[in-house]
């Protein structure tokens, strides 16, 4: 089962993570360590076979491929190219950093088949394509990082998110029960967008956009 992960945060605040200056970068490193443990460096490939000095200790913890390590953290903070085999781990790390800057996040469980059914139901009820669920991620994040395998990433403005929510709310009673429930949960969260926008102005922050990650 896949997930739709949404974050109410200004896109410029997301882009600012890449190439972040100190001490901001140090704060992000600390946040990474808090979530994933101290960012230990990966064992060099061939050096591990050269002898006891370079060999990985037998009791060393096994690091999953999608678990961020120090190199992932450093690459993101320097705005460097992310190798394809480190994209999954790097996106996990980026999500933690985005969530720390966001006004709120929301996660909805959905797979491709279910999302297609929701989109069809919305269209049948008269919701225009520009207000479809996938239209929430119509804009490129422009971070320079490609999506991981099985992932789609993008964003829309806060105004676009609010407009889409209004379109969904108007036809919710016409949707199939399961689709209406799924949309209803999302509407409850999106309904807070005007308040977050007001709060951002009061704190001299940029108004939140809607950053979206869809995983298969």
Stretches with model-predicted labels:
Residues 210:
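Intrinsically disordered, Lys/Arg-rich low-complexity segments
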């Amino acid at each position: 089962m896949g997930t739709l992960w949404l974050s109410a945060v200004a896109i410029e605040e997301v882009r600012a993570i890449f190439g972040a200056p100190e001490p901001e970068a140090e704060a992000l490193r600390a946040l990474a360590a808090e979530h994933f443990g101290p960012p230990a460096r990966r064992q060099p490939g061939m050096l591990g076979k050269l002898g006891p000095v370079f060999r990985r200790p037998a009791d060393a913890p096994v690091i999953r491929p999608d678990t961020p390590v120090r190199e992932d953290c450093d690459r993101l903070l320097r705005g460097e190219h992310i190798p394809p085999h480190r994209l999954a781990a790097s996106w996990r790390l980026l999500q933690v950093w985005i969530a720390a800057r966001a006004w709120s996040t929301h996660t909805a469980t959905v797979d491709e088949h279910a999302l297609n059914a929701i989109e069809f139901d919305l269209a049948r009820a008269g919701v225009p394509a520009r207000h479809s669920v996938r239209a929430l991620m119509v804009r490129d994040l422009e971070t320079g990082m490609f999506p991981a395998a099985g992932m789609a990433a993008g964003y829309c403005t806060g105004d676009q998110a609010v407009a889409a929510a209004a379109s969904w709310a108007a036809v919710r009673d016409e949707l199939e029960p399961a689709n209406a429930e799924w949309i209803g949960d999302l509407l409850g969260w999106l309904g807070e967008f005007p308040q977050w926008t007001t709060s951002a102005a009061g704190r001299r922050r940029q108004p939140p956009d809607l950053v979206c990650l869809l995983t298969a």
